[in-house]
Swiss-Prot record:
Family, per entry: Belongs to the universal ribosomal protein uS4 family.
Gene from which the chain derives: rpsD
Matching HAMAP family: Ribosomal_uS4_B
Keyword Calcium included in the entry's annotation: no
Domain of life according to the entry: Bacteria
Protein name, entry field: Small ribosomal subunit protein uS4
GO BP annotations, alphabetical order: ribosomal small subunit biogenesis; translation
Species of provenance: Pseudomonas putida (strain ATCC 47054 / DSM 6125 / CFBP 8728 / NCIMB 11950 / KT2440)
Pfam families for the chain: Ribosomal_S4, S4
Residue ranges of every copy of the S4 RNA-binding domain listed in the record: 96-156
Amino acid sequence: MARYIGPKCKLSRREGTDLFLKSGVRALESKCNIEAAPGIHGQRRGRQSDYGTQLREKQKVRRIYGVLERQFRGYYQAAASKKGATGENLLQLLECRLDNVVYRMGFGSTRSESRQLVSHKAISVNGKTVNIPSYQVRPGDVVAVREKSLGQLRIVQALELCAQRGRVEWVDVDAAKKSGVFKNVPARSDLSADINENLIVELYSK
């Protein structure tokens, strides 16, 4: 399955919530009615079955982090093999992706833009260029914008946007040097309460 490159608003409308796929402090434009399903007439959402609810939650999280289905299932399997709550492990694995850490540090205004920065070799980890968006960042790793990309306007603008919306506590960033330290893997309480990871576990456990 190819990566989705269509309207971001459509995905948020499909899930009925703001997925923060667009740049800016407020991810959606005012004209994007997330209360209505995609389409000209915005069909009303009927009552969902348990399976439908579980599927929508999985799709929502997958789209938030920009992960394809096969990758997402792989993360679930890795999470299930670790000690602790599978759902929490899953979210932590997604949070440790390099493209997500770049986004959390504010070098990219969206996860999609952050993934592009990584793919285009604009990011280094511990002084070495890494161009794999799914690379798992570990506590203590130093993530930085490479010297050749320091002057990119989009990075400067992304840092300004991040300063407005607030930066997460598990990264320590020097905005002037465009470098940061991934201090620790976030606890479940640090992450969005709008995600019900237990529904995803129930879906994959069938």
